[in-house]
From Swiss-Prot:
Catalytic activity: 4-deoxy-4-formamido-alpha-L-arabinopyranosyl di-trans,octa-cis-undecaprenyl phosphate + H2O = 4-amino-4-deoxy-alpha-L-arabinopyranosyl di-trans,octa-cis-undecaprenyl phosphate + formate
Pfam families: Polysacc_deac_1
Protein name, UniProt field: Probable 4-deoxy-4-formamido-L-arabinose-phosphoundecaprenol deformylase ArnD
Organism from which the protein derives: Escherichia coli (strain SMS-3-5 / SECEC)
Function summary: Catalyzes the deformylation of 4-deoxy-4-formamido-L-arabinose-phosphoundecaprenol to 4-amino-4-deoxy-L-arabinose-phosphoundecaprenol. The modified arabinose is attached to lipid A and is required for resistance to polymyxin and cationic antimicrobial peptides.
Family in the record: Belongs to the polysaccharide deacetylase family. ArnD deformylase subfamily.
E.C. designation(s): 3.5.1.n3
Length: 296
């Protein structure tokens, strides 16, 4: 039996309003629990359109057929009109998710974090995280115990900024296994549970055809020598490609693969490491990557 952490990122208003309810229904039918990370502030995702001037981002949008994948309402959100606030407008949906699944913070403003957090000072970052946590806690009526940085934009500054919130774990980076990042003080910080597997948009049209993706991913899962963690998006697997996700769950069950919330992957002593800026194939720009202590 292979155990895989299932992380669901919710980036947008539409993903929350339409994608999450569909995913909740699918997961309920398959008796699966997951970790769901919500963006709760303004939906300004359309402001990423300026990145089309960057060849790597333009190629990603073209090969993933972004207009069909996400819809124009997502691609233009927050451009010609102010971005709608996501959290309180979809409070009932978020509360329903929290009844059955582990719920954490993705971001206050997903676009702002992904585009600008790498240049923020520590206090700006702390204030942004606090605003998101406070909003999500108001919605579900209980403390938030986990978070996942938008776009995996995380480095030592993010690790230090989140430490003061005393969360159970964060999932801010890409890597191979859970670990404890070293703080500037030399002490181990809050556990990190990295995502180990590629997302749909990172490989479709580059390494894999859409119809071959599930078989390709299951092969990666079964060969994973670390602690496999897979991320889906409410805007993708909860909308245009929900049938592909259902097929993945059915095929995974046949292969003895089970999915679980990320917290179930925490156990015993964790190795030490760091979160450093790096790059991965299929994703434009830098992102947080696990570095085992003592390695370079």
């Amino acid at each position: 039996m292979t155990k895989v952490g299932l992380r669901i990122d919710v980036d947008t208003f539409r993903g929350t309003r339409e994608g999450v309810p569909r995913l909740l229904e699918i997961l309920s039918k398959h008796n699966i629990q997951a970790s769901i990370f919500f963006s709760v502030g303004p939906d300004n995702m359309g402001r990423h359109l300026w990145r089309l001037v960057k060849p790597q981002f333009l190629w990603k949008m073209l090969r993933s057929n972004a207009a069909s994948l996400y819809g124009w309402d997502i691609l233009l959100a927050g451009t010609a009109w102010p971005g709608k606030e996501i959290g309180h407008a979809n409070a009932d949906i978020i509360r329903e998710a929290a009844k059955y699944h582990e719920v954490g913070l993705h971001a206050w403003d997903h676009h702002a974090w992904q585009a600008h957090s790498g240049n923020w000072d520590r206090q700006t970052m702390v204030d942004d995280i606090a605003r998101g946590l406070r909003t999500l806690e108001e919605i579900i009526g209980q403390p938030i115990t986990c978070s996942a940085a938008a776009g995996w934009r995380a480095d030592q500054q993010v690790i230090e900024a989140k430490e003061g919130f005393h969360l159970r774990y964060n999932s801010d980076c890409r890597g191979v296994m859970p670990f404890r990042p070293l703080l500037d003080s030399g002490k181990p910080g809050t556990a990190q549970i990295p995502v180990t597997l590629p997302t749909w948009d990172e490989v479709i049209g580059r390494d894999v055809k859409a119809e071959d993706f599930n078989g390709w991913l299951l092969n990666r899962i079964l060969r994973d020598k670390g602690t496999p963690v897979y991320t889906i998006h409410a805007e993708v697997e909860g909308c245009a490609y929900q049938h592909n996700f259902v097929d993945l769950l059915k095929r995974a069950a046949q292969e003895g693969v089970t999915f679980c919330p990320l917290s179930e992957l925490l156990s015993g002593m964790l190795p030490l490491g760091q979160v450093v800026r790096g790059n991965i194939a299929g994703r434009e720009g830098w992102l947080g990557c696990q570095q085992i202590a003592g390695s370079r």
